[in-house]
From Swiss-Prot:
Component of the H1 type VI (H1-T6SS) secretion system that plays a role in the release of toxins targeting both eukaryotic and prokaryotic species. Forms a stable complex with TssB1. This complex, although not crucial for the H1-T6SS function, may fine-tune the assembly of the system. Plays a role in the interaction between ClpV1 and the TssC1/TssB1 sheath. The gene is tagJ. The T6SS protein TagJ/HsiE1 is unique to the H1-T6SS and absent from the H2- and H3-T6SSs. Disulfide bonds: none annotated. Interacts with TssB1 (via N-terminus). Interacts with ClpV1. InterPro entries: TagJ, TPR-like_helical_dom_sf. This is Type VI secretion system accessory component TagJ.
Amino acid sequence: MADPSFASGRLGSRLQGSIAMIAEELLRAGRLDDALKALQEQVRSQPSNATLRIFLFQLLAVMGQWARAQNQLKVVGELDASALPMVQTYSTAIDCEALRREVFAGRLTPVILGQPAEWIAPLLQALSLDAEGHGEAAQALREQAFDAAPAVPGRIGEAPFAWLADADTRLGPVLEVIVNGRYAWLPMSNLRSLKVEAPSDLRDLVWLPAELTLANGGATVALLPARYAETVEHGDDAARLGRKTEWLDSGLPVGQRLFVTDAGETALFDLRELDFEPTDA
């Protein structure tokens, strides 16, 4: 699995020579609370520095402090008009995190992208049953959905597979995406290809940009939630930074997203290109 130590990328190149480098070093060491304290001190000393506030927004997002991250984005937009496209993109991504939590709590239904699939309904019903404490019934519905979902072969890079699924059994053959500012589920049977690059900014550890080609030939850009939904609440700093994937006693995963196939496992940050073979459906 890729170990994305603090991937400052473009941001880091603008922080060279700044005391904010202390915060970056603390991030490399996986010390989120200490990094936040150091960065907040620097922002207080340079409140009109938009670059520092972008750094702060990203760090707060990694830590799941969504309201504070949203506030920093607002300030960035006021300080630097050229940053407004980024501000809009990630402001809606933060909003989608709230909706995402409601979906996994069984209280909301996500948008479904592409051709409707009947097997999606049991997956959503299972989330509601989980919330009501009916774990066995939820698992039965998931098994029903997995049996009905088509196994679509393809390749990860040059490595072939007969089927692919998310390691989170609540999702299985479904990909979580943020497209056009909306949180959605994309059945993998509706996906032709996915392309991503390695994380190059801290925010990529939360939402990884991707290029999607749908089975119907349409193409779009998206953000992929890079960490599992319970990561902020139940994961440690390494999980929040996407440096590992682990399972809680409840069976739920935290940390970096992981895909499983008949041939093995691939972490999201190790993935560059995923291609599914065309189907008759």
